[in-house]
Amino acid sequence: MRLVAKLLYLAVLAICGLGIHGALTHPRVTPPVYPSVSFNLTGADTYEPFLRALQEKVILGNHTAFDLPVLNPESQVSDSNRFVLVPLTNPSGDTVTLAIDVVNLYVVAFSSNGKSYFFSGSTAVQRDNLFVDTTQEELNFTGNYTSLERQVGFGRVYIPLGPKSLDQAISSLRTYTLTAGDTKPLARGLLVVIQMVSEAARFRYIELRIRTSITDASEFTPDLLMLSMENNWSSMSSEIQQAQPGGIFAGVVQLRDERNNSIEVTNFRRLFELTYIAVLLYGCAPVTSSSYSNNAIDAQIIKMPVFRGGEYEKVCSVVEVTRRISGWDGLCVDVRYGHYIDGNPVQLRPCGNECNQLWTFRTDGTIRWLGKCLTASSSVMIYDCNTVPPEATKWVVSIDGTITNPHSGLVLTAPQAAEGTALSLENNIHAARQGWTVGDVEPLVTFIVGYKQMCLRENGENNFVWLEDCVLNRVQQEWALYGDGTIRVNSNRSLCVTSEDHEPSDLIVILKCEGSGNQRWVFNTNGTISNPNAKLLMDVAQRDVSLRKIILYRPTGNPNQQWITTTHPA
């Protein structure tokens, strides 16, 4: 009888322990001690350092693409290094701890009050290593956005983000561990913490919006561009890792703007200017060790795209693509009259859909139009690829927009910004008339946000630029980014952001666009804006916005040299 009673007791205990979702079991082994990165809402100014620390913890190796860190594939991460714990605390003192997978930055579980919850379909690696000293339970929904939004009853486009929302989310997760009640507030809280932690670590655009809301103690709802970033992180990562050395995508990244218009992105430069993507999901190992020829890079201050990787299962496949090429004043590279004859000049013309502006970038380093090669000679022309010296048909496209003929060391140049101008080869002086973009030929209209989350503004021709509080729809804060590397006043696109000279402390002003080296700018993946002619960075003078001076200066690593483009500044 005692044996029967004991068995009945154990059976009842097991049934009661199942709870609403079913208790999870795990072997009694000593779990790994995972690194921890915490954030307390009472310290609003610690949000940015918190994200930097989280990024540092999830990036285990030195794998990069275009200087962006690539997360390690699952096969290269041991169980003992698989997760990072993220305790979040609200002003009431409530704390919940998230478990984040270093392979993909996903939130896979959370814990508080001696209980932990895992999403439906959780893995043995998660259950056996996370929160093993708590009562583990499994939720009846997964952690993807579709499942979470189904639990809430509406999309995350309607769910505010900000300090108040994060406060409530922490309380909702903690309360659920106490009562195991309604899943709607739980799912809503998870949508908030996932975006304010994981997505902000993936995209500086999202980080900036959240950081601004925390600083201003305000709330905002995600715009459609932000949501499309979140939905396309995987495809962005894949395209970047499989891009040609100059950042030319094999496919198209589909985003949406705030008005729900489609944005088709075909190169890294435009994607970065739109999203400021900060971390990549592993897709494949790049086959290219460097995106530069020696001739194209020697004078550059920021060596942007360098691929580095270890031993991977999958190697990226780089394919040929056909795109338009935009240069000085937004004009496109065009075969004169579309004549298919050797020696026909290549010229500038307004961008259109004509076939004589469609260039195929081959993996052998040639750029072709209907099979004929873009050829370096006394001028730039098309020619039969088999009848000219091979070195005359080879080109290197750099991420900064330079197109170089490696044999001569000369770069593709537009002598004038006029329709019909024949292109030439000249020494590289990093001038705007030597800047090009492949694909995405239309200028991008944006705000430029810098030190103390303030916006860059212009005050007309021959005047300085400076920082002021961001104001949506203020035309003086709107800029057009051109494929030639110029930053133009959006309300008057004949005016360019210009350095007065090329020495440290030289002022940055607004002048007529002339295609000079003082008017060409590169948005770097480290958050700086460089002038490749001067080899200096855009800098808020003395870290004092009241001086109303933006200058050129040597790299310091200080926050007054950090910038981000955004279509929604406040």
Curated annotation (Swiss-Prot):
Placement of 1-beta repeats on the sequence: 370-405
EC number(s) from the headed UniProt entry: 3.2.2.22
Record carries keyword Protease: no
Active site, UniProt feature: 199
2-alpha repeat ranges per the UniProt record: 452-489
Repeat (1-gamma) residue spans along the chain: 408-440
Keywords: Disulfide bond, Glycoprotein, Hydrolase, Lectin, Nucleotide-binding, Plant defense, Protein synthesis inhibitor, Repeat, Signal, Toxin
Post-translational modification: The precursor is processed in two chains, A and B, that are linked by a disulfide bond. A small truncated form corresponding roughly to the second ricin B-type lectin domain of the B chain, TrSNAI, can also be produced.
PANTHER family the UniProt entry points to: PTHR33453, RIBOSOME-INACTIVATING PROTEIN (PTHR33453:SF34)
Recorded domain comment: The B-chain consists of six tandemly repeated subdomains. Only subdomains 1-alpha and 2-gamma possess a functional carbohydrate-binding site.
Protein's UniProt name: Ribosome-inactivating protein SNAI
Lineage: Eukaryota, Viridiplantae, Streptophyta, Embryophyta, Tracheophyta
Gene from which this protein is expressed: SNA-I
